[in-house]
Amino acid sequence: MLAMPSQRTAEMGEATMEDLKVTANGYDFKPAHAAMQRYVDGNLLAGISSAVLVGRDLVDVNCVGWADKEAQTPLRADHIFRIFSNTKLITSCAALLLFEEGKFQLDDPIETFIPQLANRKVLRPGASMLDDTEPARRSITIRHLLSHSAGLSYGLFDPGSVIFTAYNERKVLNPATPLSGMIDALADLPLTYQPGTSFEYSVAIDVIARLVEVISGQPFDKFIQSRILGPLGMVDTRFVVPEKDQGRLVAYYAGADLMDPMKPGLTRTDNSPYPGAYLKPVPRFNGGGGLVSTLPDTVALIRSLLPGGPTLLKPETLALLTDNQLADGVWLRFAMMGELKGKAYGLGGGLILQPSPIDHPDSQGEIYWGGVAGTQWWIAPKRNMAGVIMAQRQMAFVHPFSFEFKRLAYEAVKQAR
């Protein structure tokens, strides 16, 4: 039987605009605000909203620019964003709630629950044919899936590769099929590497969403509503924006040049990733990137993962979020960016083990992630701070604006101490 929401979540209340009132003073965020305004004035981003917490206290909330640049609609904190891969944190937390109930162990083979993923084949290094494989040396585990080390792919970021072609031909990402259909599409596709030996950003968290369905006996959207979104009061976080709220959905833009993120110019692209996205129901509850949300809702989620009050997960589970789950010597890697040395992955997001030149020096130990359109969150346990920043531009996950904001936010908190 599915457990009822815990006392921890039941005590958390509803995420409202009242929750976005600054409750601790003495922090100077004017440099961060001015920097974000420059991105808007430079026609690099239409609008940016942000919030920063020290402990559980909000020390800054800010909105600059437009929800709809063409209509000159000012961006407000209650505007709704396509959060894409920010969805992954909610999906990972959903699975970890079941883990806390003893429904599975992290190193359980996934075929215990999803038999179609047993007996995997793995592409040989340099393979140019889909059948150029070798047997997997071990099963995919739930830990591998939560940390993107299972050998799965997205079939998005490596055009021309054999796995890119296969994922697209099998329509692995097809929103017109349910999560069970995605599993069927993956069933006879090879892995890109031996489970547990590397990192590749992938549909692994969508597999986790299906795992939640199988274990709970509920559709994924119903589970997260009853166990996370409802208890946390995340009233605007869902897979489809209701018609009455569609006026609050911010416009979606593409930059002038994918390879030059600082080239001015924005083009409307509201029909991405497909016409009607987020406006009408589809069979796929995309646990890796299908939700919309708001600044208050995302702050409520992040606050629920911080010490000092009721938490969504137990303290020992929260500690797992900041434990590196990748093999020794394995770092994050993306097809268009290469290896990100010093960046690893936990059970809910990326980890900064060694800050890079574009990170603040105080960010060591930070857990973070974000969506492809520029919605990001981070938690810095060593600095007792956290933050959320939201924009809506294609391929803005690694846009300079977010790195600059985080550096300035860290500095504002540091200078106040």
Predicted regions mapped to residue ranges:
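Active-site SXXK
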Residues: 30-37, 56-58, 82-110, 205-213, ...
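Short, conserved catalytic-motif segment at the N-terminal edge
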Residues: 22-83, 103-105, 122-127, 131, ...
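Acidic helix-start/capping segments at beta-turn-to-alpha-helix junctions
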Residues: 111-119
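Short, surface-exposed loop or secondary-structure junction motifs
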Residues: 120-361
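Short, hydrophobic/aromatic-rich segments at coil-to-beta transitions
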Residues: 361-367
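Short, Lys/Arg-enriched N-terminal segments with co-localized hydrophobic residues
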Residues: 1-16
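Short, well-ordered beta-strand elements
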Residues: 62, 372, 376-378, 383-393
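Generic C-terminus detector
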Residues: 393-417
